[in-house]
Amino acid sequence: MAFKDVLLTLASYPEPTPVSVIDDAVSVAAALGAHLAAVSCEVHAEVRASLLGYVILDIPALIAREAAKSRENAKALLAAFEASADKSGVRHETIFEHCATASEAALLVDYARLRDLTIMAVPDSHDLGYAEEVIFESGRPTLILPTGPRSRPLRLDAICVAWDFSRTAARAVSDALPLLESARSVRVVTVTNEKPLDSRHSGRELAKNLARHGIEVVLDEIDAERKPIDEVLTSYVLSHGIDVLVMGAYGTPRWREFVLGGATRGLLSKPPVPILFSH
């Protein structure tokens, strides 16, 4: 199934999503020929204090100031989104919501469940739980965009699949098929000597499966050499000019960990390239 209905989440608090993320998301939607909806929330901070502290610190005024800051950021982000989408000719809509800080992630999950793909970034000021909630609870793939400066424009030409024969890796491949089918090159990489792998032949079998979709792949195995897995994958995608990394995620509400072991927080907090996560 092609990605035809895409969601972009724009954080307004405590710091706004960088405008560069908007342009990247619009570029993705344009490449996919998809409709793009941008959602941003006016966030109301929840402050706990004693009755005395509530009076001395004037908590209601503090909450009102922070809500106004969030509202201004959200409005500015949505206006920038509309300008970028109009310029690129991308069909779009804007969604302005109100929510408490504790319920923002759940609200985004509700919208993400009704879209083919969600695009989001994780600003430095945000806890990773902001993205984890969408990745784990939406039931849809999530494309995490880097927020730092990039040396070249975002493209979807060269894609790498991080493959370990797990259920979630298989789900990620399935969810990423629209991207894989339109890519100019696809690499499937397995990291060895990092954890036991269920099948040494699975890479070749996956290549056969993708070939039946008209996707020719290059198979690679790289030795972890006792390095953190996020460093291994980061080095690989940067040295091979990868545009998008595809990988699976698994977890429970109490304890979450991405496949490929320690790749989790390192890649989510500092993605070297856009990463398509699927659970």
Spans of model-derived segments:
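Structural beta-alpha unit
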Residues: 1, 43-44, 82-118, 212-245, ...
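Small/aliphatic-rich secondary-structure junction motif
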Residues: 1-63, 137, 147, 155-222, ...
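A short, flexible beta-alpha/helix-coil linker loop
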Residues: 8, 12-13, 99-100, 125, ...
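Amphipathic coiled-coil/heptad-repeat helices and related helical stalk/stem segments
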Residues: 18-21, 104, 127-128, 169-172, ...
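Gly/Ser-rich helix-loop-strand patches that form or flank binding pockets
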Residues: 22, 27, 31, 106-152, ...
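Hydrophobic/aromatic beta-strand patches that form the interior of the parallel beta-sheet core
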Residues: 37-39, 95, 119, 143, ...
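A short acidic, glycine-rich active-site loop
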Residues: 60-76
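Short beta->alpha connector loops
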Residues: 98-102, 123-126, 166-167
